[in-house]
Amino acid sequence: MSSLSKEAVLVHEALVARGLETPMRAPVQEIDNETRKRLITGHMTEIMQLLNLDLSDDSLMETPHRIAKMYVDEIFSGLDYSRFPKITVIENKMKVDEMVTVRDITLTSTCEHHFVTIDGKATVAYIPKDAVIGLSKINRIVQFFAQRPQVQERLTQQILIALQTLLGTSNVAVSIDAVHYCVKARGIRDATSATTTTSLGGLFKSSQNTRQEFLRAVRHHN
């Protein structure tokens, strides 16, 4: 991982140490993204042919390539740590010691069990210690970890650990409220249920007042 940013390496190592990294095998050989897309295109062609779809139809002929490009460049791009957002933490010169909360962070992820959509919003809060982070960077970290096959519980914890690692403080809290299309569009076909997951660290876990302040922000968001 020598070509990766220091921040990407630190976050990846922290997740591995806690058993919270997305299950990924070591590649048999390194391949570039264009080769990856070409191989996925071939496999998607086979899948569509097995479904008796006519790939000579002008509506379908480019679908295998579109899916491959979508997988590599978009919805699974968070598997590639070379795409980890550029993060600059700033010295906390103003000595901010109150909660900083970002609400209504939109996220779209993919259920790793059925490869269908997870659609939701996140609320993220932290109490600065020695460093603060640009607010948009929190959104980018949420989006990075959402862009991979996921389960919501792990996604919530990955965001927490990433921010704790980058900010040098355990005082981080994350809550996600999302609709799972593996529930909405198949199986039970429940169109109205949503799933909420919360991960708390530091004062958010040990202090009832701090925890309640965060949960009030989450309820306001909902």
Swiss-Prot record:
> HAMAP family, alphabetically?
FolE
Q: Give the main EC class.
A: hydrolase
Q: Which organism is it from?
A: Klebsiella pneumoniae (strain 342)
Q: Which family does it belong to?
A: Belongs to the GTP cyclohydrolase I family.
Give the GO molecular function terms.
Answer: GTP binding; GTP cyclohydrolase I activity; zinc ion binding
Q: Which NCBIfam families match?
A: folE, PRK09347.1-1, PRK09347.1-3
For this protein, the Enzyme Commission number is 3.5.4.16
Kindly state the subunit structure of this protein: Homomer.
Q: What is this protein called?
A: GTP cyclohydrolase 1
Keywords of the record = GTP-binding, Hydrolase, Metal-binding, Nucleotide-binding, One-carbon metabolism, Zinc
- Which residues are recorded as binding Zn(2+)? C111, H114, C182
Q: Which domain of life is it from?
A: Bacteria
Q: Which reaction does it catalyse?
A: GTP + H2O = 7,8-dihydroneopterin 3'-triphosphate + formate + H(+)
